[in-house]
Amino acid sequence: MVFVACGLNHKTAPIHVREKVALQPAMQDSLLSSLLDLPEVNEAAILSTCNRTEIYCDTNTPEVLGNWLAHEHQLSEELLSQFLYIHQGKEGIKHTLRVASGLDSMMIGEPQILGQMKQAYQHACRLGTVKTQLRPVFEYIFRASKRIRTRSGIGANPVSIAYAAVQLIGQLFKNYHSLSVFLIGSGETASLVAKYLHQHGVHRFLIASRTLENAQKLAETFGGKTLSIGDIPQYLPLADVVISATACPLPFINKSLVEHALEQRNHAPMFLLDLAVPRDIEGNVNELEQVHLYNVDDLQSMIEKGMNERRNAALQAEQLIESELDNYIRWHRSLRAKDVICDYRNQMHTLAQQELQRALKKISAGQNQQDVLNEFSMRLVNKLTHNPTIGLRQIAWDNREDLLDLARYLFDTTANQSLYEEIS
């Protein structure tokens, strides 16, 4: 098994490239199936967020991943290769550990990425594209990333893209309490935005979603009016703040729509934050006066501020990554001995049960228990050591001193000899 992590993120690709390869929920099953149709790919999972699209798979031919990604999204392979990274084996595990721990996020230490990776893994398991090879790798990564976050404290005082959005609103508006907020989308990011805004004193929400039931749940939790996506033009003029975080493939808020809303607001300022990838709001909306439009890339400069306390934690987390990586390598190597250990233990258990049943029959027949137990002990020792004894004699006859040293190590005879000498 060769673990490979391949993809692009906010560090390697601008938003106009990331949105072209972003995985839409409706496409997830078909893309995973298409990926597994490649004869070179044995197992795979795909993670897609606003800041990254990554493929985790078992393959000996990682170069096919870039070709597949370009073909599926109708992009030039030459163009995509400028932004793509491929990490194999140990480096692939290290990269995935860094992602799961929040070390590779735009906002260092943000906790959402681990949940998103778990969801991607669980979906791939349900679809059958993750099986016996990748399953233990992901499970180890999830356990290790939890240890890293706990020990380093990198997840203390949780911060996310959603929280950064709320902080940005606070810089532009002095009073949260007077704001009317139009929240478009009802997923995890939208829920976090609503939660943080509510904690800061916002009580006037308009909540629109393609799934009305999800919008109603948000409205019940934080208060507000539930709308459908089709209601956006009618209610947009009422919003001081518009935050959009849907999974729509194309923008649905354009310049003319916002311009019309401004006219009805008597050109009172509007703050629009597009947290979606692909974008929900056309970029030329920012050309309008009294409109402040930001997308996820615009949050980068703000995110850097106030992260100093996390940078120290990140340094410690990086050290823990190396330690966990060493642990993973040892654990993965140990898997090669798993079948041998199981077979050996089963063999020893069978021998022990045979001798135990023989001894119990003799005791039931009235023989002296002490004599039976002495015989049981001697016979068990002889049977357990019979094959190893024959093997040791053979390697001694063959003058294989290296194998004799290995036997001493396995049977720990040096330690026992030292113990005997100490006692005598």
From Swiss-Prot:
The gene is hemA. The record marks H95 as: Important for activity. Keywords: NADP, Oxidoreductase, Porphyrin biosynthesis. It comes from Legionella pneumophila (strain Corby). Belongs to the glutamyl-tRNA reductase family. Substrate binds at T49, C50, N51, R52, S105, E110, P111, Q112, Q116. During catalysis, the active site Cys acts as a nucleophile attacking the alpha-carbonyl group of tRNA-bound glutamate with the formation of a thioester intermediate between enzyme and glutamate, and the concomitant release of tRNA(Glu). The thioester intermediate is finally reduced by direct hydride transfer from NADPH, to form the product GSA. NADP(+) binds at G185, S186, G187, E188, T189, A190. One of its GO terms (biological process) is protoporphyrinogen IX biosynthetic process from glutamate. SUPFAM superfamilies: Glutamyl tRNA-reductase catalytic, N-terminal domain, Glutamyl tRNA-reductase dimerization domain, NAD(P)-binding Rossmann-fold domains. Possesses an unusual extended V-shaped dimeric structure with each monomer consisting of three distinct domains arranged along a curved 'spinal' alpha-helix. The N-terminal catalytic domain specifically recognizes the glutamate moiety of the substrate. The second domain is the NADPH-binding domain, and the third C-terminal domain is responsible for dimerization. It catalyses: (S)-4-amino-5-oxopentanoate + tRNA(Glu) + NADP(+) = L-glutamyl-tRNA(Glu) + NADPH + H(+). Catalyzes the NADPH-dependent reduction of glutamyl-tRNA(Glu) to glutamate 1-semialdehyde (GSA). Its EC number is 1.2.1.70. It comes from the Bacteria. Homodimer. GO terms for molecular function: glutamyl-tRNA reductase activity; NADP binding. Pathway: Porphyrin-containing compound metabolism; protoporphyrin-IX biosynthesis; 5-aminolevulinate from L-glutamyl-tRNA(Glu): step 1/2. The active site is at C50. It is an enzyme of class 1 (oxidoreductase). This is Glutamyl-tRNA reductase.
